[in-house]
Every structure is written in C-alpha cells, then in structure tokens.
Design a protein with these regions (language model features):
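Juxtamembrane intracellular "pre-TM" segments in multi-pass secondary transporters
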Residues: 1-16, 197
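Helix-to-loop junctions at the C-terminal end of transmembrane segments
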Residues: 65-78, 163
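Short amphipathic helix-loop junctions that connect adjacent transmembrane helices
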Residues: 33-50
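Intracellular juxtamembrane helix-capping segments at the cytosolic ends
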Residues: 119-132
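Paired small-residue
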Residues: 93, 104-112
C-alpha cells in the first residue's frame, strides 16, 4: 500500500502521455486531406489513390526501419535527448511537406518523418517506467496507450478542421507548430536538464 501511494513526478508522466498522443496525431493529421492534396498534382484517379496509399505507408515504413537503431541510440545517449531530437526532426520535416511541387516529393519526406519518430514510443515507455513506482507502471502505461488512441481520433479531426477552414497546406504547418511545442516542452523538462538532455 505504501508503494502504491509513493509520490512521483506527475508532470513528467503527463508530458509523456501528451507526447505519445502527438506521435500518432502527427501521422494521422493529414489523413483527411491527403487524397485531395495529391490530387492537385496528379490527375488520374488510380494514380491519386495509389500515391495516397504509398504516402501514408511511407511514414510507417520509416518508423519500422529506424526503431531498432533509435532505441539503441537512446540506450547509449539517453531517452530524453533522443525524444527531443526526434520531435524536433518531425516538426522540421512537416514544413517542406506544405510546399511540395510534385506528389512524389511527399514520399521521402514522410519516410524521413517516420524515421525521426521511430523508436520514440519505447523512449516514452522507458521514461514512464523510470519515473513511477513499480506497482503503478501498468496503470500509467495503460493511460499512455489511451493517449495514443486519442491521437488517432484527434489527428484526423484536427486535419479536417484546419483543412476545411484554411486549406490543405496549413494542415502541415499547424501540425508542425504542435509538434514543435511538444519538442520544446520535452527539451525544457527539468528532468531532461538534470540528465544533460
């Protein structure tokens, strides 16, 4: 009972929940607009559909390939450093996506964005595990999973609202600002400072 009531840094854990949500949010925010966006550059229906599928898959493929290496890097240099760098990388890679001049340009940009996010979920899990009592780890990680599903819901909603109100390119820029804020919060975290980032 004493262990269950042991104090821990809730601000750190909440920041990790937010980050977990935004990792999914960043990938899903373009879903409502991607087909129309690509349709500005391609004119055959089958080509638009195929390219849309490839673009959505590119980020996931990048994450699959980079996750083992990012996880290994985090073990060596620290989870906070890798987390902050990955979030900043994602934010930066969203900017050129708003200014493409041909549909194929989205493929390498989404792939690189996926690579920057690959392995960050294990970083989040490790940070949570190191900051909560052992008897509460399961519950806190459960909330982290719920946060990811919130990102899966809020990402497309956000993209749809922004795209409907201001157009498709601002979806990428607005997502960039959200990810940049999360990266800044992670970088400025007292625990990250204490660990030398």
């Amino acid at each position: 009972l004493g262990e269950a009531a042991a104090p821990f840094d809730r601000a750190i854990v909440r920041l990790m929940w937010l980050t977990a949500m935004l990792l999914v949010f960043a990938n899903m925010s373009i879903e409502p607009v991607i087909t129309l966006y690509i349709g500005q550059f391609l004119h055959q229906e089958h080509a638009i559909i195929l390219m849309s599928g490839l673009v959505m898959a590119a980020a996931a493929l990048g994450s699959i390939l980079s996750a083992p290496f990012v996880g290994k890097l985090a073990d060596r240099v620290g989870h906070w450093r890798v987390l902050s760098a990955g979030l900043f990388g994602c934010a930066l890679l969203l900017i050129p996506q708003a200014f493409i001049t041909d549909a194929w340009q989205l493929l390498p940009l989404r792939f690189l964005m996926g690579m920057s996010l690959g392995g960050l979920m294990p970083c989040i899990t490790a940070i949570i595990r190191h900051n909560v009592p052992a008897v509460q780890v399961g519950r806190m990680l459960g909330y982290s999973t719920s946060a990811q599903y919130i990102g899966q819901v809020s990402g497309p909603l956000f993209g749809g609202v922004i795209g409907g109100a201001w157009g498709m390119r601002p979806v990428f820029l607005a997502t960039c600002m959200v990810m940049g804020l999360c990266a800044w919060l992670s970088w400025r975290s007292p625990r990250a400072k204490a660990q030398g980032r």
